[in-house]
Amino acid sequence: MSHTILDPTGRAAVADTGVQGAHAPRPSGLTGARVGLLDNTKHNALLFLTEVGDLLVSEYGAAGVSIIETKKSFSVPIDDEIVARYQGACDVVVTGVGDCGSCSAAAVADGINFERAGLPAAVVLTDAFLTTGRTMAKVQGAPDYEWITTQHPMAVLTPDQVKERARLLLPEIVQALTAGEAA
């Protein structure tokens, strides 16, 4: 007896090819880069991303944050239309914060979608949802896809704590977005 397993992303199955095709070329540094931020609607995500964007500009010479969008639903991966907007507006993307099961899975799928479109992406998940993220990476055909992990939870942090977390994760975010800039 066989059972049909449905892909929760609503997309056709992708062959398990590792990270090939899911890893965009990295710039050597962020000087002059246009930064895109994708807010998944979770509490504190936009504050965190905005702080990261500001730090990328002030400390790594990024040209600025050129696009910020908020997803309509944290649990649904972005579509090709959103990816195309980012392709035209930025050079690198930071997205998150995955701090629940469905939003973590969608954040990983979003990062993979950006990468496949040629945009280096730094995805931030909390440590409580690593299995969910890894499962989605496998479903998307990129089982070795990497993201930045932070302590759970994010939603209950004060604004100052969120900013502190952004500063703490900044070196990992820079490393995820670049091929060689020391963090």
Q: Which residue stretches match the model-derived regions?
A:
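Short Gly/Thr/Asp-enriched flexible loops that form oxyanion-binding sites at enzyme active sites
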Residues: 105-115
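N-terminal amphipathic/basic leader segments beginning at the initiator methionine
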Residues: 1-24
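A charged, well-structured terminal subsegment
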Residues: 148-183
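Short beta-strand elements in bilobed, periplasmic/extracellular small-molecule ligand-binding domains
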Residues: 58-73, 144-151
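Structural motif
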Residues: 72-84, 162
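Glycine-rich phosphate/diphosphate-binding loop of Rossmann-like nucleotide-binding domains
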Residues: 33-54
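Short, well-structured alpha-helical segments in soluble
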Residues: 79-91, 110
